[in-house]
């Protein structure tokens, strides 16, 4: 699905075929040139189509998108990192977050929710949060330096340290005041499922990317 990673020859047709069944025009997508940072971008109606057909006009150095505009599909691309879907049904605002370990360290989920609160008057008790497929604690081996980055979500097994990327973001959502019954997790590990998902850890930098999309109807 990516225009920058993996075999991109069929990326546009893949996007079209995937989104057609959802009633979404792939040419309307708003995408970001993700940088594993924590910048959150508000998307206005005039931004429709940015990054849809070319990587060049996507939002640069951006890893989270929010909007309150209808028929404006937001997209992020992952291959082990965690896609986080946010929906405020009361005020009709949405957000989509690309949360790798670096963005998680910088609390990108919190920054996204705070901007939704500022712009949409979102109340965290109303917020619905969804975690898509990502590398899970079963497979996410990391170095001892991660103890300097996270005080939670690290476990040791057979002499190796493992990171719970989803668990850290879930705790962050709960700490913000999101109701635990409003948190939904796919429980899918990208590393464990080579036939269904790309995995940067498994395949290396040349692997393709999955696309996550959210839109207000």
Task: Give the label of every model feature segment.
Residues 1-217:
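Active-site microenvironment for binding and transforming phosphate-containing groups
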